C-alpha cells in the first residue's frame, strides 16, 4: 500500500490518502473502512442530459465523489471493494444526498476520513504501508567475504545490508589471519541480522551459501549468542534454515526461493506465529484450563485482573458496526499491551483465524490460574468457559 498523505491530529481527527497496489492491500482497506466513515475517490456516474428538443440522452462521466459509507462489500475474486453511501459534497453530476456505489480497485487512489481514528486502524495503515512490517521472510545470501541481508515480502525483495570484508587467503603459516578475517566477517553479518530482522514479524530466516560457509557462520552465530547471551537469536533459533546458493550475490535468491524445501517452509510463514499461539491455547485448555479462556465475558474479566499474557483476537471483531463495541475491543488491546501482555490479531481469511472464530473470535492465555472464572455463571451464548466445548482441528 502506498501512503500519499496522512493528516491525523492529537485528537485522532483527520484523514489519510492511500493507493492499494496489490491484492493484500484491498484486504487492509476492507479492514480499515467502517460504516460512518467518509471516502473520496474517482468514479464513473451515468448522467441524464436533456436536449433542446426535450429528448434525453445518457452518458457516462468520470467524476470525484465523497460518500458517507453505509455498506461495504469485498469481492475477493475480482479484488474490488464496493462502498455504498450518500454523496456528502457538492458535485455537478450528483446531487447532495444521492446514493452512489464507489468501486475501490488496485492502483486507484482514495481518501479516508473517520469520525475518530484509533490505534488499531493506525497500526493497520503502518503495517500495510511499511514493507518491512509485512516481510515474513529474511534471507542472508553469502560467500566468503560477501553477504547480502534481505527482507522478502509478497511483492518485493529489500536489501537491508551489504557486507564486504577482505579475508586473507589461507596460506601456509598464515591460517590465523584467515580465521581472524572470517570471524570479523561473521560478526558483521550477525550484527546486521540483529539490526535489520524484526523477529516479531519475520517467521523464517534463510542462510544460503555455496560450500560450507552457511554452516560455519551458523555455528559461529549461535556460539556467540550463547557466549554473549543474545536472547533474540537463542529464542528464535528454530526460524533459521540453511540452504544452498551458488553465490553471495542477490541474484542467488531466485534459485533459493525455487527450492521445494524453502517453498514448503515459507508457505506457512504468514500466520505461523498465530498458528503456534492457537496450538498453545488448545494445549493449555486441556492441561491447565484455569489459564485459558475464550469468549468476551471471561477475557474482559481476566483483563481487569491484568492476568492476560497473550490475547488472541480476530480482525473480524474490529469490523463490527457497533462503534462502542469496536472501542471496547480497541481499549482491551491497549490495556493488555500497557500491562506487558502480547496481542495476536488473527486474519479471518486464514485457517487459524477461522479456528479462532469458532471460539467466538477472542481468547486469552493467562499468566496465572483464575479458577473463579470457570465457576462464574455464563448465560450469554457467545461466551464459553475454558475446558468447555472447544475442539482442536489440528490435523
Swiss-Prot record:
Listed cofactors: a divalent metal cation
GO cellular component, one term: cytoplasm
Gene3D superfamilies referenced in this protein's UniProt entry, alphabetically: 3.30.1330.30, eRF1 domain 2, Pelota, domain A
An MF annotation (GO) of this entry: RNA endonuclease activity
UniProt note: phenotype after gene disruption: During spermatogenesis results in blockage of cell division preventing spermatocytes to enter meiosis and lack of spermatic individualization resulting in sterility. In germlines, increases transposable elements transcription at both mRNA and protein levels.
Protein localization: Nucleus; Cytoplasm
Classification via Pfam families: eRF1_1, eRF1_2, eRF1_3
Region Disordered, residue ranges: 371-395
PGF motif, short sequence motif: residues: 210-212
Gene Ontology biological-process entries: compound eye morphogenesis; female germ-line stem cell asymmetric division; germ-line stem cell population maintenance; male germ-line stem cell population maintenance; meiotic cell cycle; meiotic nuclear membrane disassembly; meiotic spindle organization; nonfunctional rRNA decay
Tissue: Expressed in ovaries and muscles (at protein level). Expressed throughout all development stages.
Bias type Acidic residues, positions: 372-384
Claim: Metal-binding is one of the keywords in the record: yes
Keyword Electron transport: no
Keywords, alphabetical: Cell cycle, Cell division, Cytoplasm, Meiosis, Metal-binding, Mitosis, Nucleus, Translation regulation
PANTHER family found in the cross-reference section: PELOTA, PROTEIN PELOTA HOMOLOG
Domain notes: The PGF motif may be involved in the interaction with HBS1 and is required for silencing of germline transposons.
Family under the similarity heading: Belongs to the eukaryotic release factor 1 family. Pelota subfamily.
Assembly with partners or alone: Component of the Pelota-HBS1L complex, also named Dom34-Hbs1 complex, composed of pelo and HBS1. Interacts with Pink1 and Cnot4; the interaction with Cnot4 appears to be Pink1-dependent.
Described function: Component of the Pelota-HBS1L complex, a complex that recognizes stalled ribosomes and triggers the No-Go Decay (NGD) pathway. In the Pelota-HBS1L complex, pelo recognizes ribosomes stalled at the 3' end of an mRNA and engages stalled ribosomes by destabilizing mRNA in the mRNA channel. Following ribosome-binding, the Pelota-HBS1L complex promotes recruitment of pix, which drives the disassembly of stalled ribosomes, followed by degradation of damaged mRNAs as part of the NGD pathway.
Protein name per UniProt: Protein pelota
Organism: Drosophila melanogaster
